């Protein structure tokens, strides 16, 4: 488990060299996970630190391949919940996180809105 201060110290030591943009809907997903007590703030920092490490690795691969790198990966929280991040690099070293959702057995966990959309279709 990583506290906020430890996360910031580690990020400063490792010098993550990219900007991260998280759209408001993904940010709201983060906030709702904390509000619903599914994750503590420390667990969110832990997941975000894992994201940063993974991004750093993917960025090195993208630079080596000289192409836009688009990918996703899974992170397991300490309480057993699993999440999937999907992100894409832009040419100006900017990272865009465009998806974050909870998974069950590798598949997206259905929410009430997903069920309503499915019924409406």
Give the positions of each predicted feature:
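Ribonuclease/tRNase effector modules and their secretory precursors
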Residues: 1-121
């Amino acid at each position: 488990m990583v506290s906020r201060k430890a996360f910031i110290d580690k990020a400063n030591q490792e010098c993550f060299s990219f900007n991260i943009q998280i759209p408001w809907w993904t940010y709201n997903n983060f906030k709702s996970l904390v509000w619903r007590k599914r994750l503590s703030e420390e667990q969110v920092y832990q997941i975000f630190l894992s994201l940063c490490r993974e991004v750093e690795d993917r960025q090195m691969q993208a630079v080596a391949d000289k192409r836009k790198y688009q990918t996703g990966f899974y992170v397991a929280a300490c309480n057993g919940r699993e999440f999937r991040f999907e992100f894409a690099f832009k040419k100006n070293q900017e990272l865009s996180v465009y998806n974050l959702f909870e998974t069950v057995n590798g598949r997206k966990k259905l929410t009430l809105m997903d069920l309503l959309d499915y019924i409406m279709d």
